[in-house]
Amino acid sequence: MKRYYITDRKAVGGFRPLLEIIRDQMHLGVDFIQIREKDITARELFEFTLAVLEVRENEMRKRLPIKILVNSRADVALATGADGVHLPSNAPEETLPGLVVFRSCHTLEEIKASRADFVTFGPVFESPGKGEPAGLEALKAACQLGKRVYALGGVNWENAAECMHAGAEGIAGIRLFQDPAL
């Protein structure tokens, strides 16, 4: 089961604690880290991405490669040497040579139209502020469309196996990786 960690510094008290969580998740074998700090400047995003890449460089001697993705900003991903970008569902479809591309999808139609390398699909389960959950049957249908799908939204360690059974390549989340209670 592949794991896709989406960051939220506000939930953990800032950049310094977030870097510690990122380091811990690298040691725990996370496969992707999406830097999703939407409210910071391009300069701050650039600098934080470089800090995450430095942590990865220091930790890679001990682990398999971990892909670092920048939320919405292909320019920052390219400028920092990050591995890819995560695009929201409303972003224009584009080809970004040299970058791994994830796209948020909330409907089967969005998945069918996507040219991304991977998609996150959800919310699969109940998740605060994310609307009506799609459910496992919709996830199963999404996974049958020939895309590499990561289940998102309300996923926890107890229901992760159900997502994998539905055909997901992996699981994605914020609280899943930042909240020890999950």
Predicted segments — roles?
Residues 77, 125-130:
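A short acidic, helix-capping loop that chelates divalent metal ions and anchors anionic groups
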